[in-house]
Regions:
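Surface-exposed peri-terminal alpha-helical interaction modules
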Residues: 1-79
Length: 79
């Protein structure tokens, strides 16, 4: 098993870039003409907020929990 400090060292730059990219995307949405309304009401962005909360929590298996947030749990249509 690798040392946690080594994992941080190897992945920090990419994690930082992903955070900055997400922040820039949210800023672009907010600056759009209806951005404030969309930021507060769009179901996709609500899922993104839930995913960010899952990332911030101390519980393990963050990737699985985030995947479940974005998974479509709607039953398939009857054929």
């Amino acid at each position: 098993m690798r040392d946690a400090s080594k994992v941080v060292e190897e992945t920090f730059a990419e994690m930082r870039w992903r955070c900055l990219s997400l922040a820039a995307d949210l800023d672009r949405i907010q600056r759009a003409s209806d951005g404030g309304k969309v930021l507060s009401s769009d179901a996709r962005l609500n899922k993104l907020r839930a995913a960010l909360q899952a990332l911030l929590g101390p519980e393990p298996d963050r990737a699985e929990r985030v995947q479940m947030i974005f998974s479509d749990t709607t039953p398939p249509p009857n054929r």
